[in-house]
Design a protein with these regions (language model features):
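Conserved C-terminal helix/tail region of periplasmic/extracytoplasmic solute-binding proteins
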Residues: 80, 174, 396-446
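Extracytoplasmic ligand-binding clamshell segments of periplasmic binding protein
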Residues: 223-300, 348, 432
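C-terminal lobe and pocket-closing loops
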Residues: 290-311, 323-418
């Protein structure tokens, strides 16, 4: 996150940002601001006085952004916006149970981009096609728009994008005589050299498929593909197997994390403890916004939460390298979509909130805080520092999970956590792939 003002990307990062915009979007489209007359398709009159609820997932939406939304919604409608934070761990269950319930549904909800196909095909969200152009149209992240579409109509739009990149301890790497690797093969070998009984060369949990899948993607593998009009799991594909075997070796040779640990908080492991004790990890991979939790301990805030200050002498970042020197590996494209519940009785107020969220000012606010904006016109507002460059460079080649109608069920049943965990425990990769292909095939098409 870049909290110290609006800065433009340096030439190298700007070139990456432009490429990212071209990769993820088409061109042209609309845009609006919270002030002024509501565009066609909105009902500003009907929104007056409506109190609405907005679910955000986890803590990624910063307090500054939440306060902005509450204030702007009050100004625009006179109504109250209640923002409720949901934990990612049980969000899927809550969405499944409450979206169909008119009395308990959120009016607007953030939703993981990988869950969007399931809920859109199930009819859980309102049709946003009439206001799509007003909210940004083709300037919005194309891959995120696609996962929220059904029959050419938009039901869930991008909220923000993130990407995962490597954070490393410069002091530990330099002491070992290691430089930033240029290929995935070099990375795997280097982090293995850094492992000790008390320190992971690369801290990654065995069940952490969202990061582990980068080794699959880097070797040309996929989790699933569409065959005709059906989706099929491709864990047994030769290229996928190559990536899974690399992950298995990496986990054994470089990580001390439990085989049962999933997508967690590895930044805790790369930091020194409060008392200065050595870190338990020399290298991690995490979403870009995690760097605000990495650094030297500088005390606690008024809520008792640790404050960390980045130290360039100790910490550094780089995109996970790919199999070809100089090219980043494809990583899992983090981020969220946003949608209006079809069961909400306050559609006008919900649309007004979306108008504020997709306004120029809010898109800039997201970028300032290190969250990739939904509207690619504002990618440059991410800044020009090392974090912005690593975010853009890693996002250039990032990939989403399959846009299959049953994908939310795959994630909800934690099939991939179980699969990757068994691989981390040393299981037969090919046999496990065949077993879990069958499990995924049974539910992936909804």
């Amino acid at each position: 996150m870049i909290r110290n003002g609006k800065r433009r990307l340096a030439l190298t990062a700007l070139a990456g940002a432009s490429a990212l915009a071209l990769t993820l979007t088409g061109c042209a489209g609309g845009g609006d601001t919270p002030s002024g007359d509501a565009p066609a398709g909105f009902d500003a009159e009907g929104a007056k006085g409506q109190d609405i609820t907005f679910w955000v997932m986890g803590g990624d939406t910063p307090d500054e952004a939440r306060e902005y939304l509450v204030d702007q919604y009050k100004q625009a409608t006179g109504g109250t916006l209640k923002i409720q934070q949901q934990d990612w761990t049980d969000a899927l269950t809550k969405l499944t149970n409450q979206l169909p319930d008119e009395k308990n549904t959120p009016d607007v909800t953030e939703i993981g981009n990988t869950w969007s196909p399931t809920f859109t095909t199930a009819g859980a969200f309102s049709d946003l096609s009439p206001i799509y152009e007003d909210l940004g149209g083709d300037k919005l992240l194309h891959s995120f728009v696609e996962v929220g579409e059904v029959d050419g109509k938009q039901y869930a739009l991008p909220y923000y994008f993130g990407s995962r990149y490597v954070t490393y301890r410069k002091d530990i790497w330099q002491a070992a005589g290691l430089e930033v690797p240029t290929t995935l093969e070099e990375f795997n070998a280097d982090v293995a050299k850094l492992k000790t009984p008390g320190q992971s060369g690369f801290y990654i949990g065995g069940q952490d498929w969202r990061n582990g899948v980068s080794w699959v993607f880097a070797n040309g593998g996929e989790l699933a593909k569409k065959d005709g009009d059906k989706w099929v799991s491709t864990l047994s594909d030769a290229k996928t197997i190559t990536g899974l075997e690399q992950f298995q070796t990496l986990f054994e040779d470089a990580s001390n994390a439990p085989a049962t640990e999933d997508d967690s908080t590895p930044w805790v492991n790369i930091n020194n403890d409060k008392d200065g004790a050595a870190p338990s990890a020399a290298t991690i991979i995490a979403p870009g916004w995690a760097h605000w939790s990495i650094g030297d301990y500088v005390g606690d805030d008024d809520k008792g939460k640790e404050k960390r200050e980045w130290n360039d002498e100790i910490f550094g970042v780089f995109p996970l390298p790919g199999t070809t020197a100089g090219e980043p590996a494809p990583v899992f494209a983090g981020g969220s979509n946003i949608a209006i519940s079809a069961k909400s009785t306050k559609q006008a107020g919900a649309k007004e909130l979306l108008r504020i969220i997709f306004s120029d000012d809010y898109q800039k606010l997201l970028a300032k805080n290190g969250l990739g904006p939904a509207n690619t016109d504002f990618v440059g507002d991410l800044g020009d520092d090392q974090f912005a460059k690593a975010l853009v460079d890693s996002a250039l080649n990032s990939k989403l999970t399959p846009a299959a109608p049953g994908w939310a069920a795959v994630e909800g049943q934690k099939i991939l956590e179980e699969f990757f965990g068994k691989i981390a425990e040393g299981g037969d990769v090919k046999a496990l792939a065949k077993e879990y292909d069958a499990k995924i095939d049974a539910i992936i098409n909804g």
